[in-house]
Amino acid sequence: MSMQDPIADMLTRIRNGQAANKVAISMPSSKLKVAIASVLAEEGYVESFKVVEGSKPELEITLKYFQNKPVVESIQRVSRPGLRIYKRKDELPKVMGGLGIAVVSTSKGVMTDRAARQASLGGEIICYVA
């Protein structure tokens, strides 16, 4: 059976991996998943990530914990294949009053809501992370 929403699967793997106190998780790789992992890493929600090349490239994400608790409190998919959510630059949401981030896919690539606001860009809201 084919996967309907690979991004939701990625977010679920991160959520489940941290709930099970895993050190690292792996999943099939794609350009969008690597871009999302890059945003999560630069914002400090995951330790690191790497793409393991092979016949089918795998994305390996090293999860981050603080005092034995997951750094990611919640991670939730917003825009999905059946209902895409797009926002203009002035409509971009602030997650937890600015404490969390919204991952946004813009014409200039995948970035946080903060970076999109500074660049005056709107786009598709991929997920919220807090």
Swiss-Prot record:
Role, per record: One of the primary rRNA binding proteins, it binds directly to 16S rRNA central domain where it helps coordinate assembly of the platform of the 30S subunit.
Record organism: Glaesserella parasuis serovar 5 (strain SH0165) (Haemophilus parasuis)
Any GO MF annotation of the entry: rRNA binding
HAMAP family xrefs: Ribosomal_uS8_B (MF_01302_B)
Disulphide bridges: none
SUPFAM superfamilies the record matches: Ribosomal protein S8 (SSF56047)
Similarity comment: family membership: Belongs to the universal ribosomal protein uS8 family.
Quaternary structure, from the entry: Part of the 30S ribosomal subunit. Contacts proteins S5 and S12.
Superkingdom classification of source: Bacteria
Alphabetical UniProt keywords: Ribonucleoprotein, Ribosomal protein, RNA-binding, rRNA-binding
GO biological process: translation
PROSITE patterns the record matches: RIBOSOMAL_S8
GO cellular component, one term: ribonucleoprotein complex
Name by which UniProt lists this protein: Small ribosomal subunit protein uS8
